[in-house]
């Protein structure tokens, strides 16, 4: 399924001209890892460990947001929130995945420009709270109610 992805990172303005996501960053790719140190020994008696939340990363073309993203990273600026929105491309343009983060810090900006291609950068975000919402598609093509994963990383609690 083709998707458009947009990032609203604090008050940093990107180059999106989209009506619903004007001045946001147009995202090329997204990644985020959550792991758990659970251990299941032979004979049973295993237990869950503590979840480890890696930085969420996006890749986008170098654009007018780049200097401000670099500045926020270099200064350790705290951003109130950031939102990554995935939208089905084409007619209807339904937003099916929304990742909202609170108390955000940009922990890395890695720029690259292989060969004669235009440059891109990977921006890494660390955050204190996340609300990850997915809206499944129904048989008629509309979206169902959102299913949430909400987690307070600082207190290590769901919700």
Which functions belong to the PLM regions below?
Residues 1-159:
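Glycine-rich, low-complexity intrinsically disordered segments
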